[in-house]
Amino acid sequence: MIGVYTADDIPGSVKVGHLKPDWDTMIPVGHVTHYLGDAICLIAAETPEILERAKALVKVDYEVLQPVLDPFEALKEDAPRIHPGIQPDGNVLAHEHLVRGNAEEVIANSKYKVTRHYETPWTEHAFLELECAVAMPFDDGVFIYSSDQGTYDTQHECSMMLGLPPEKVIVENKLVGGGFGGKEDVSVQHHAALVAYLTKRPVKVKLSRQESITVHPKRHPMWMDITTACDENGYLTAMKAVVVSDTGAYASLGGPVLQRACTHAAGPYLSLIHI
């Protein structure tokens, strides 16, 4: 055994995150976990066998709270606030409005119009190579080999967590091994960096397939109500849509994902939209 580390051992910010610092590197004692992939503590060992034996000795007492399981529950006035310290006004991360021309008037005057409800499920990215990072002490900071999709985001969030200037955190990105959006957030990089910084030893953190599925964010489920209109010749004239996206427990890149969904909703075919 090398050591067991908790949120109390983090020298800088416990929380990280691309758009909002809402994701705990480790959940402090007495705080709230938000999904199955939240880290409670880190265990470092010389061999996988010792690591598994040590993991089996960890006991956690949970108080079960009422979960919020979809965006429609989260939108209710009496819904629990997911991140009250960061987003005290509610559970909505982002609004997007795209308006071009007077779509409502054109729809009303079009020969044909169709309104349908569509849903897409969350999607596992299923990249071939699993998340892995190797970190080592380097010049009063850390050097990280990573295989993520955001080298500078990894540097920024690890330096914030360690309380170091960015130049003390060097990140070299190796081959990603597939990502498709599933490796944009930090997953193992900050944990490897923290243990390497604390122990002054090289550290590898690698997820199994089941751990990977549990930990990394998924493609966002969406609920869409779309009205599409066309003229008597079948030429599309305008579109109106409402899109609700589920970014899950944390902000991640939920705002830009919603923006992209709205931007692409009409494809290249319609110049009059209201989304």
Identify the residue ranges that each predicted region occupies:
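Beta-strand segments within the central parallel beta-sheet cores of soluble alpha/beta enzyme folds
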Residues: 7, 167-174, 201-210, 237-242
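Flexible, low-hydrophobicity surface segments
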Residues: 1-90, 113-116, 198, 264
